[in-house]
Amino acid sequence: AIIRNPNSTRPCQHVIDVLNAYIILASQLRLNKKLHGESFNFGPSISKNLRVIDILKISKKIWPEIRWSVKKEKKFFENNLLQLNSNKAKKILKWKCLLTSEETVALTIEWYRKYFFKKNIMSLSKQQIKYFENK
């Protein structure tokens, strides 16, 4: 892979964290009719963002065959910082990401590695859900 901006930061969030957020929202919608029609963002705190290079280093520990090179190109505009404002979800729903950014990257890379090598994804998915439930 070619990496253009290794020091750019990216939010890391696992799909299980997002699904958990929607389950919390659904339960709150049932209890509080004032929330009907409200919109919510679910994303990690900006302080949890990782640099692209750090995401790659974590990924390489899980999948040693991963290779990349840095090639700074100016022809593509790319934001150095990406983020969602999830303050409303945190305040009203008392929601937060349960997985760290490092756990998110590790679980995601582990899943894709097993998928790539045609391993039992259902079993791994169940293990990862159990891991999340124990957080």
Where are these regions (language model features)?
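C-terminal substrate-binding subdomain of Rossmann-fold SDR/epimerase-dehydratase oxidoreductases
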Residues: 2-135
